[in-house]
Structures are given as C-alpha cells and as structure tokens.
C-alpha cells in the first residue's frame, strides 16, 4: 500500500510543482502572474488565481492523458474487431462491453483491451464518455465464470456512464488549488522570519515541502470520494447486469484480493478490486461492505 500511495502522490505533486515553477519563472521574468505586492506582502486574489491555474491545468492534463497513460502503464492490448481477427474469448469480451455500453446509454463504444497479469481485476478510464477504455486482466478472464465477468464489466461501464473520471478530475483540481494556495502562504510566512538574503531560497524550498505535506492531507479527500464512487458504480453495475451477477462478481473478487498489484499507482483508483482492508488511504471500500450494501438494495 505504501508504494502505491507514494507513487500516486508523487505523480500529482510533480505535475503541479512543475507547472508552478514554470509559471513562477515566467512571472519573475515578465512581471505577469506574480502574487507578491510591492512591499513584500501577498496579493491573495492573484495567488488564488495562480493556484487555480496550476491546480486545474495539472488535473486536466492528467485527464487528457489518462487513457494513453493507462495503456502504457498496464501494457494494454486494445481489441479492434474491425482491424484484427479476434479469438472467440476476445470477441465475446468486446460484445459484452458493447452490449452493456448500449444499455447504459453510451453513444460511442469504449475501447476494449486486455492486459497480461495474474491479478483478477479490471479498470475503466478516459477523458470522456466518448473517449473511454475498459480493460481486463488475463487473470480475470482465466479465473472468473461468465456471470462474474459480466458483473465486473457492468461495474466498469457504470463508471464511464457516471462520468467518474471527469468528476474525480474536478475534485483533484480543487484539492490541488488549495494545496498550491496554502503551501505558498505557509512558505511566505516562513521566509519572513529568516534573513532577507536567504528569503528567496527558503521560500522556494518551503513551497515544495509544504506542497508535499498538504498534498498528502488533500489526498484523504480524493481517496474518500474514490471509495464513495465505488458504491455508485456497484449500483450502476447491478442495474446493467442484474443484482445477482454484480454480487456474484464481488464475491468472486474476494477470493483474489491477494493478487491485486499495487505498483500501477496511476490506475489504482480506476480498478474494481482494491486491497482487502480499507484505510484512510484506500481507493476502494471493503468488498464485504460493498456486497452488504448491494444485498440491502
């Protein structure tokens, strides 16, 4: 879990830190976009605008690249029935995703892919409903029966139909905005108590340190929302495939939680199967709790 969380946070921190540094350099050279006043104070409105630009540009850049990044990170082989000959199993997978997508009201079918892994898992990603991807592991296709596979696919299609990637991006943009804003307020306060000649370098280092600390705190909000959206996708999957198939899929996944790979941090929040035990930094709730909620529906 620690490695996954570290990589997830690091990727987000690197994006907003890089953008922040670039904009700061541009501001210092041109005077455009700087948030310091003439007497060394802070222009709160200018800083808030600066923070929003950094925060939302970073999150939307990640969204636009999400499908490509997932393919690269997971080694996804996209199945295209119009350009290649598919095996019976591959064609069946594509047909199921298309059937569920039409039932969910999607006007453009998602890309369908397979990635080579013993883990029993699947994920959905993409910048919009019209540019989405549903991918499953070879382990899932080998271990699960047809009803369980359909339940898993319905869950992933529900994520796309619900627009979860865009919503997560907006939330991450808001969190990033506050991280950038308060990191610079705190760094400015620290730089005021050191010698004047040291203030610029202290401010620069303090911004990075506070940005890391506040990003960790802000990630708690993102992870909490990620757990919340899993319940919605479960309900959506039950509507598409049937409640019994969705519950059967989750029960089947319980048997394979030990196989869930944690190194693909960039798509951890997108997968249907998380780790067995939930913590504040978990992207998924306990499977047993998800099953109980569906049964009570």
From Swiss-Prot:
Binding residue positions for Zn(2+): 155, 159, 230
* Record-linked Gene3D superfamilies: Metalloproteases ('zincins'), catalytic domain (3.30.2010.10)
Q: How is the cofactor bound?
A: Binds 1 zinc ion per subunit.
One of the entry's Gene Ontology molecular-function terms is: metalloendopeptidase activity
Requisite cofactors: Zn(2+)
Locate the active site: 156
For biological process, the GO terms are:
proteolysis
Give the domain of life: Bacteria
Question: Which cystines does this chain contain?
Answer: none
Pfam families in alphabetical order: Peptidase_M48
Q: Where in the cell is it found?
A: Cell membrane
Question: Could you tell me the membrane topology recorded for this protein?
Answer: Multi-pass membrane protein
Residue spans crossing the bilayer = 5-25, 44-64, 170-190, 204-224
Q: Which family does it belong to?
A: Belongs to the peptidase M48B family.
Q: Which HAMAP family match?
A: Pept_M48_protease_HtpX (MF_00188)
Identification of the protein by name: Protease HtpX homolog
Lineage of the species this protein comes from: Bacteria, Bacillati, Bacillota, Bacilli, Bacillales
């Amino acid at each position: 879990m620690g490695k996954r969380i570290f990589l997830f946070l690091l990727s987000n921190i690197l994006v907003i830190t890089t953008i922040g540094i670039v904009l700061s350099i541009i501001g210092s050279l041109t005077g455009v976009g700087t948030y310091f006043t003439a007497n060394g104070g802070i222009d709160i409105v200018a800083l808030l605008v600066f923070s929003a630009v950094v925060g939302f540009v970073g999150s939307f850049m990640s969204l636009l690249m999400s499908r490509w990044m997932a393919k690269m990170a997971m080694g996804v082989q996209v199945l295209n029935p119009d350009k290649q000959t598919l095996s019976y199993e591959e064609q069946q997978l594509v047909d199921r995703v298309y059937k569920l997508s039409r039932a969910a009201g999607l006007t453009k079918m998602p890309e369908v892919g397979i990635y080579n892994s013993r883990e029993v898992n699947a994920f959905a990603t993409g910048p919009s409903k019209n540019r989405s991807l549903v991918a499953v592991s070879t382990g899932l296709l080998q271990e699960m029966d047809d009803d369980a596979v359909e339940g898993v696919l319905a869950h992933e299609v529900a994520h796309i139909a619900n627009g979860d990637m865009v919503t997560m991006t907006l939330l991450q943009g808001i969190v990033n905005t506050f991280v950038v804003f308060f990191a610079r307020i705190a760094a400015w306060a620290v730089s005021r108590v050191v010698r004047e000649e040291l203030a610029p370098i202290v401010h620069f280092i303090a911004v990075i340190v506070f940005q890391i600390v506040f990003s960790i705190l802000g990630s708690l909000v993102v992870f909490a929302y990620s757990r919340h959206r899993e319940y919605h996708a479960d309900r959506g999957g039950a509507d598409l495939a049937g409640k019994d198939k969705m519950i059967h899929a989750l029960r089947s996944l319980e048997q394979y939680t030990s196989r869930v790979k944690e190194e693909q941090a960039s798509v951890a929040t997108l997968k249907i199967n998380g780790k067995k035990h939930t913590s504040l930094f978990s992207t998924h709730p306990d499977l047993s709790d998800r099953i109980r909620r569906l049964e009570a529906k």
